[in-house]
Amino acid sequence: KMRELIPYATILTPNLTELYALLDIDYPSEIPSYDELEKMCKCLVDKGAKMIVVTGINVKNKLINFVYEEGKKYRIVEVEKIGDERSGTGDVISGVIAGKYLLEQDFYKSVEAAANFASKCIKYSQELGVDNHLGLCFEPFLKEL
């Protein structure tokens, strides 16, 4: 059903698993190259999406966010990987991207702001000792957005 909504989407924010599901492709044993990611994003653009960020690609203690906009060269937003995965991180990232974009911020800058915001919240959550399944503590930092 999600695939049917692609033509109506301006922004898509899939992680790798979701990207492969949207394209109905089997999940690979290796992380795709940037060229492969670009081809997959172009397929989503061909289906109607305008902007895509493939979030949270784990590469050597870094998290890569692959940013693709229709008609432009892809760009990368990279942040340090902090701890293990936390529930809700993708939701926070998607929310910040949407909010910043609606405030007429450039898409790439929106992704950059979202990645940095999530990193700050994850670090704070770890300092507080919050269990990963409880997500990230973002409320103290909302005013910074």
Q: Residue locations for each model-derived region?
A:
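Phosphate-handling active-site elements
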Residues: 73-75, 100-114
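Alpha-helical structural signal
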Residues: 2, 93-94, 118
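Short pre-catalytic strand/loop immediately N-terminal to key active-site residues, enriched for Gly-Thr
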Residues: 74-88
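Conserved phosphate/ATP/ADP-binding segment of small-molecule kinases
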Residues: 1-74
